[in-house]
Amino acid sequence: MNRTSESVEPQQNEKTAVHWSREWVPVVVDTYSNEDDEDNEEGDESRPQRTFLVKRWVQDNVQVEKKGDEETAAADN
């Protein structure tokens, strides 16, 4: 994973003026341990997870379109 790519400010494209901001984004990470956890019950197959807050560049006012909508729009053209 290239950590520097996330910390570099995105470049503005004049044709598609997108506003960017730095925001805290929750990232869920599965944690595994080879040791038996004392607090886990016997037969518990759940995977322990930890949530970290990471500051990343995100687009302001982004509307997420479904992939199917893009395909139908391309077919209409």
Curated annotation (Swiss-Prot):
Tell me the domain of life.
Eukaryota
Region feature (Disordered): 1-20, 31-52
Q: What induces it?
A: Differentially expressed during meiosis.
Where do Polar residues bias regions lie?
1-15
Query: Where does this protein have compositionally biased stretches of type Acidic residues?
Result: 33-44
What name does UniProt use for this protein? Uncharacterized protein tam8
Q: Which organism is it from?
A: Schizosaccharomyces pombe (strain 972 / ATCC 24843)
Q: Which gene encodes it?
A: tam8
